[in-house]
């Protein structure tokens, strides 16, 4: 049992916060998943970062680059600005946040409006850096059974 404070900024202990998502419990909403992903970067949990990315994108992730960025950064904090649950089938959401870190090049901050989709009781991050080759009439990569244009297409490219 960990007695450390969760890196996500909630003020809760890791085991009572993001730690149980890292251990396999599905995050209940997109904001919880986003916070747990930030904590995973802080803790170097690369398998968790990959597993919580949309399955159709997982093969396109550069695990070594993710691990290097995670390890070479000192994580300074996370601010969640907004979480929008959009509903629908499957359910979609946006979470707007700013993450701060320090590396050899100095202090950085990154503001993003991330898109998420829920499938089979689990939330997944839709990674804007991983290309998907899905035509508008192709089956949606989130495995909803719908055409891409009726499901996740509008969530690609909607970043702040």
Swiss-Prot record:
It comes from the Bacteria. InterPro entries: NTF2-like_dom_sf, SEC_C_motif, UPF0225, YchJ-like_M. Disulfide bonds: none annotated. HAMAP family: UPF0225 (MF_00612). Belongs to the UPF0225 family. NCBIfam families: PRK00183.1, PRK01617.1, PRK01752.1. PANTHER family: ADENYLATE CYCLASE-ASSOCIATED CAP C-TERMINAL DOMAIN-CONTAINING PROTEIN, UPF0225 PROTEIN SCO1677. This is UPF0225 protein PputW619_1140. It comes from Pseudomonas putida (strain W619).
